[in-house]
Amino acid sequence: MSITSEKKKSLMNIYAIKEDDTGSSFVQCAILTERISNLTEHFKVHKHDHHSKRGLLILIGRRRKHLNYIKRKFGNEAYQELIEKLGIRK
């Protein structure tokens, strides 16, 4: 269910604002989105895993907070661009 360090590094390279950017909200949203998609695939097989479902809801809440921060700090344009890149929402 967790993502590999190679996958994290590739996400960091794609969504980083500057070189060696590991903690920006853009990178964290990308990593959280990957974890959420992995858990979603897990639930297609294990429908009754309620313990992990709580973890999924926590991850979704964290991503929502980062997205709100991006929208507030960097503007609606950066927010919409990130959502399109990640493939979430409308």
From Swiss-Prot:
Keywords: Ribonucleoprotein, Ribosomal protein, RNA-binding, rRNA-binding. SMART domains: Ribosomal_S15. One of its GO terms (cellular component) is cytosolic small ribosomal subunit. The keyword RNA-binding applies. HAMAP family: Ribosomal_uS15_B. Belongs to the universal ribosomal protein uS15 family. This is Small ribosomal subunit protein uS15. It comes from Wolbachia pipientis wMel.
